[in-house]
Design a protein with these regions (language model features):
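Conserved SAM-binding loop of SAM-dependent methyltransferases across substrates and taxa
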Residues: 79-90
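Conserved short alpha-helix immediately C-terminal to the canonical SAM/SAH-binding motif I
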Residues: 80, 101-105
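A short SAM/SAH-binding and catalytic strip from SAM-dependent methyltransferases
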Residues: 145-157
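A short, conserved alpha-helix within the catalytic core of class I
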Residues: 154-166
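Conserved SAM-binding motif I beta-strand of class I
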Residues: 92-97
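S-adenosyl-L-methionine
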Residues: 1-66, 104-141
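Conserved class I S-adenosyl-L-methionine
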Residues: 67-76
Length: 171
């Protein structure tokens, strides 16, 4: 289905919906709890978030075609994927997150989004929203057109591996 949320929702309504979807989700706390148990030594797992307004502006600068595929590598609770879905017209929106608890939060948000969009009578489908629980280094992203990675805390080794992976992207 190619009826994009952007066609039905104003920017202010999209932001309002986004804020309500994330009102009870604390990605920082989820990440902190997970890192204490599993990843405490690796600083590459430090969680960070994006702002709706600024990320929307960044995406608009990319000028994606409607057949473009958007990836977020290290998608956390899925914020960039949800913002992209609400404000842009991509063919697919794919988030890849290694931390299970963050991934589960993203799935929960997608389910809440489905419920919120029911009032449009099935005209807006979240079928193109895909969340994968895995290391992005183990996923084939070569079909991606726009790749986002909030990599400010990625260590040198991870950045080198990511650079090699990005070289496989279509041009």
């Amino acid at each position: 289905m190619e009826n994009y949320a952007k066609s039905f929702l104003s920017t202010s309504h999209s932001e309002e919906l986004f804020n309500s979807l994330y009102s009870t989700i604390d990605g920082y706390q989820i990440s902190l709890n997970s890192n204490k148990r599993k990843h405490s030594k690796n600083k590459s797992y430090i969680y960070g978030e994006i702002d709706f307004s600024n990320f929307t502006k960044l995406l608009a600068e990319c000028k994606p075609a409607t057949d473009s595929i958007f990836y977020d590598l290290g998608s956390g609770t899925g914020k960039s994927i949800i913002i992209s879905f609400l404000t842009q017209e991509f063919k697919k929106y794919i988030g890849i997150e290694v931390i299970q608890e963050l991934h589960e939060s993203a799935i929960q948000v997608k389910q809440q989004l489905d419920t919120s969009l029911n009032k449009y009578g099935g005209l807006i489908s979240t079928e193109s929203l895909i969340f994968k629980q895995n290391s992005f280094l183990k996923e084939d992203i070569s079909d991606g057109d726009i790749i986002f990675a909030n990599s400010t805390c990625f260590n040198a080794e991870l950045m080198t591996e990511l650079s090699s992976q990005v070289e496989t992207l279509k041009i």
